[in-house]
Amino acid sequence: MANSKSAKKRAIQAEKRRQHNASRRSMMRTYMKKTVAAIEAGDKEAATAAFAVVTPILDRMATKGLIHKNKAARHKSRFAAQIKAL
């Protein structure tokens, strides 16, 4: 348990950041699931629209440090390839 005043403050800040990051990560995963669902349904228009929504979200999460930039690039590349194959 935090003993000093500064350690208590840092613990509070860390918990606040953890909750914020969890919310952002959940939002990102939700949009990714929508894209996957559209691809699996074979609906190219819906998949393209979902991809257009999820792309800037992945970029933003990578910029903020929530995910690695290579992970964002990998997801975008795989989504694009799957949509192109429809």
From Swiss-Prot:
GO terms for molecular function: small ribosomal subunit rRNA binding; structural constituent of ribosome. Disulfide bonds: none annotated. It comes from the Bacteria. Residues 1-28 are annotated as: Disordered. Keywords: Ribonucleoprotein, Ribosomal protein, RNA-binding, rRNA-binding. One of its GO terms (biological process) is translation. InterPro entries: Ribosomal_bS20, Ribosomal_bS20_sf. Signal peptide: none annotated. GO terms for cellular component: cytosol; small ribosomal subunit. Residues 1-27 have a biased composition (Basic residues). NCBIfam families: S20 (TIGR00029). Belongs to the bacterial ribosomal protein bS20 family. Binds directly to 16S ribosomal RNA. This is Small ribosomal subunit protein bS20. It comes from Vibrio parahaemolyticus serotype O3:K6 (strain RIMD 2210633). The gene is rpsT.
